[in-house]
UniProtKB/Swiss-Prot annotation:
InterPro entries: Ribosomal_bL17, Ribosomal_bL17_CS, Ribosomal_bL17_sf
Subunit structure of this chain's protein: Part of the 50S ribosomal subunit. Contacts protein L32.
The species this protein was found in: Pelodictyon phaeoclathratiforme (strain DSM 5477 / BU-1)
Protein name per the record: Large ribosomal subunit protein bL17
GO terms, molecular function: structural constituent of ribosome
Annotated PROSITE patterns: RIBOSOMAL_L17
Keywords: Ribonucleoprotein, Ribosomal protein
Keyword Heme appears in the UniProt entry: no
Gene Ontology CC: cytosolic large ribosomal subunit
Domain of life where this protein originates: Bacteria
Gene3D superfamilies hit by this protein: Ribosomal protein L17
GO biological process, one term: translation
Region (Disordered): 121-140
Amino acid sequence: MRKVKPARKLGRTAAHRKATLSNLSTQLLVYKRIETTEAKAKETRRVVEKIITKARKGTVHAQREIFKDIRDKQAIRILFEEIVAKVGTRQGGYTRVIKLAPRFGDAAKMAVIELVDYQEAPSASQKTGKQDRAKRVKGSKKTAEAAVSVAG
């Protein structure tokens, strides 16, 4: 009797799905945090958790096994030099999926997937970025009106 495998197909062929998950995994290892759809984030979490667990072994065989999934030498280097050192003795749960608001164009469920040990608090410039921009826009509007009134 046919049994259903517990993986999401993501509406793709097997080769396309493998390539998509490989690319998402590579980007997650390089950038530590990516925004994607919720289904892709959850599938990427399954792949990345297994990759990091293999990497913790640190053997040549583990490197070769990981290189099957991630064909990027920079991502492999980051994985073995930075991420494995950072996760230390953590027994799993290396990633976190945070749900976001739906995407504007098609209302797809969006999520952020990030590595747990790479939380960075937003800097002061990031926190006030929108406020500064609003002030500049308001200020530029006033200066534009003043220039029109002087010219007119």
